[in-house]
């Protein structure tokens, strides 16, 4: 599992992320700017760890990166995408508060790694994005702002069931 945090923000981060991607991780998960940068898109840059691009604009880069690295690439945003080089699956879940909370991307990468330990990579990544996004949607209804959202997501993950997932996530 590779989460190229801040790839594109500095030359050093981009270089290290590229070196790690060359080690054939099972899944690479990042925001659109990180995936665009890691795939070698000229002019791709991030604002620190925040994305300056939309996930749907990075699906071609994700597919190319998946082919080159021989892995599954997950791009997160308002809609998430999981690409294996042949095709991409879109995951519709989450909440607008999620990008405003620190460390949720890292938490999602940890959940994705756990799923990938027991299921095939593409299925694992799509399922992790759906479950985490559904947890975010439910948690956001219980919070008044982004500050308590990460803790509420943890609690919601603990309580996650099939009915909640079906109400708050859709794959296409």
Where are these regions (language model features)?
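Short beta-strands and strand-loop turn motifs
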Residues: 1-4, 45-47
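Short, small-residue-enriched loops and turns at beta-alpha junctions
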Residues: 6-10, 81, 98
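Conserved phosphate/ATP/ADP-binding segment of small-molecule kinases
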Residues: 11-88
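Short, small-residue alpha-helix embedded
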Residues: 37, 100-130
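Charged C-terminal helix
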Residues: 134-172
């Amino acid at each position: 599992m590779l989460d190229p945090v801040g790839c594109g923000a500095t030359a050093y981060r981009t270089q290290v992320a590229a070196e790690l991607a060359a080690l054939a991780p099972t899944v690479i998960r990042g925001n659109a700017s990180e995936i665009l940068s890691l795939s070698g898109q000229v002019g791709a840059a991030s604002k620190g760890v925040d994305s300056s691009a939309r996930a749907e604009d990075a699906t071609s880069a994700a597919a190319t990166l998946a082919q080159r690295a021989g892995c599954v690439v997950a791009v997160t945003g308002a809609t998430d995408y999981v690409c294996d080089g042949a095709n991409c699956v879109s995951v519709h879940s989450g909440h607008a508060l999620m990008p405003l909370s620190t460390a949720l991307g890292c938490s999602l990468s940890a959940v994705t790694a756990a799923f990938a330990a027991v299921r095939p990579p593409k299925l694992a990544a799509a399922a992790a994005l759906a479950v985490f996004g559904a947890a975010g949607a439910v948690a956001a209804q219980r919070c008044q702002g982004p500050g308590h959202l990460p803790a509420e997501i943890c609690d919601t993950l603990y309580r996650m069931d099939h009915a909640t997932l079906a109400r708050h996530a859709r794959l296409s």
